[in-house]
Amino acid sequence: MLRIAATALLSLLLLARHSLRAAEPAAVMNFSCSGSAEANDTRRPVKKIGLTINILERTVTVSGLSVFAHVDSADDVNILFGGESTIPGDLGVTGSIDRVSGEAWYLTFTRGKDKKVNRREMFDLVCKRVQ
């Protein structure tokens, strides 16, 4: 009887440990996003924009952009990110993704030689996790 109880307890402990591992957030999260982009008061649909978030390296990449963003803050729900090139006139990005609902946005901008920020495009997206 003691052997059966010990086996059952060991099984429960192993299951609990496996469940805890499954609940841990993935270090790298890939999203496929669709929605709209707005520039100069003109809105257009966008599809299959890839977002890759690496929590350990604290980086975010957006498909089609030449700049890498850094994770400014992250919690169980929201990830805020931003980054820009050090070369005047090059692209910058700032944004956020709700990893529970999949709602995301990001804004691209350039900064002129005068350090003035010029808005390029605003993206409103709904994202789904992909492998």
Question: What are these model-predicted stretches?
Answer:
Residues S66-A74, L125-C127:
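Short, surface-exposed loop motifs enriched in S/T, G, D/E and P with embedded aromatic residues
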Residues T7-L15:
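Bacterial N-terminal signal peptides
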Residues H18-A22:
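Sec/Tat signal peptide C-region and signal peptidase I cleavage site
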